[in-house]
Amino acid sequence: MRIAVIGAGKWGSALHLALKENHNCFISSLHQRDLEDFVSIKEALECEYLIFALSSQGMRVWLKENFINKGQKILIASKGIEDQSCQFLDEIFLDFVPKENFCVLSGPSFAAEVMQKLPTALMISGINQELCKKFASFFPDFIKTYIDNDVRGAEICGAYKNVLAIASGISDGLKLGNNARAALISRGLIEMHRFGKFFGTKEETFLGLSGAGDLFLTATSVLSRNYRVGLKLAQNQKLDSILAELNEVAEGVKTAYAIEKLAKMKGIYTPIVNEVVAIFKGKSVQEATQNLLKQND
């Protein structure tokens, strides 16, 4: 049995390091990397189990350019919504593999802490529960895995919390205090759940590891690149320069636009996301924050 992680960024590297403890695990990306166990894309695609840790915005292009055997088993470890199509990652993968052959990984997990082998709990969601259990068995003892079948709920939580982390970073960057941040995060959880209900998700998903757990982590720590984007926006830095300086993908930026578009199409009330997008488009962080503080729900 061989496993390949597709994507050699921080998260992909952390997953590879964890999985190689007990299994024959390789890592691959579009560009050659000087990494232990690095293999070409062609070699990676010969593995039975694939774990995708690519940018959500680049996922479709990668899948179109590289042939995946429909019998291969896939774990989607990326978190985001495609901006152009407003499609969730499972919808993108359905164009290439049957839904019984993939699962979604979610939950509170900073790559740096996984690489340090610190205790971590993750959720694996899929309609094929046996496949979920199989992927769960790959992880070492310091990573506790749970399984469920709410794929869409896990995806919405993983994507939405990145946008809320930007909002939280803005609040902290403006030095509005712990009370304001707590209010923002709790209202953000309600907003995220309201959005998810439209897609038939389970309420417990939003209260568990995938939702509240990942949100509380991502929206309160400088280890979160999305939170750091918010901090810098509060300092009146331009988004383009922030992203260039970050030199990493902050999934919450593109995801915010996708959620805003989806919410408008479906008639879902998403005030926090709307204000974050307005800031991206030039609205002052002070005005946007004041608007949020005045909201009644």
Curated annotation (Swiss-Prot):
Can you say where in the cell this protein is located?
Answer: Cytoplasm
Which InterPro entries does this UniProt record tie to the protein? 6-PGluconate_DH-like_C_sf, 6PGD_dom2, G3P_DH_NAD-dep, G3P_DH_NAD-dep_C, G3P_DH_NAD-dep_N, NAD(P)-bd_dom_sf
Q: Which EC number(s) does UniProt give?
A: 1.1.1.94
> In the UniProt record, does the keyword ATP-binding occur?
no
Question: Top enzyme class of this protein?
Answer: oxidoreductase
Question: PANTHER family this protein is in?
Answer: GLYCEROL-3-PHOSPHATE DEHYDROGENASE (PTHR11728), GLYCEROL-3-PHOSPHATE DEHYDROGENASE [NAD(+)] 2, CHLOROPLASTIC (PTHR11728:SF1)
What's the name of the protein? Glycerol-3-phosphate dehydrogenase [NAD(P)+]
The record ties this protein, via Pfam families, to: NAD_Gly3P_dh_C, NAD_Gly3P_dh_N
Gene Ontology BP annotations: carbohydrate metabolic process; glycerol-3-phosphate biosynthetic process; glycerol-3-phosphate catabolic process; glycerophospholipid metabolic process; phospholipid biosynthetic process
What's an example GO cellular component term for this entry? cytosol
Q: Which family does it belong to?
A: Belongs to the NAD-dependent glycerol-3-phosphate dehydrogenase family.
Sites binding sn-glycerol 3-phosphate sit at 79, 107, 109, 161, 214, 224-226
Chain sites annotated for binding NADPH: 11, 33, 79, 111, 225, 249, 251
Known catalytic reactions: sn-glycerol 3-phosphate + NAD(+) = dihydroxyacetone phosphate + NADH + H(+); sn-glycerol 3-phosphate + NADP(+) = dihydroxyacetone phosphate + NADPH + H(+)
Pathway where this protein functions: Membrane lipid metabolism; glycerophospholipid metabolism
What is the protein's known function? Catalyzes the reduction of the glycolytic intermediate dihydroxyacetone phosphate (DHAP) to sn-glycerol 3-phosphate (G3P), the key precursor for phospholipid synthesis.
**UniProt GO MF annotations:** glycerol-3-phosphate dehydrogenase [NAD(P)+] activity; NAD binding
Please list the residues that make up the active site: 161
Q: Record's PROSITE patterns? A: NAD_G3PDH
Keyword set for this entry? Answer: Cytoplasm, Lipid biosynthesis, Lipid metabolism, NAD, NADP, Nucleotide-binding, Oxidoreductase, Phospholipid biosynthesis, Phospholipid metabolism
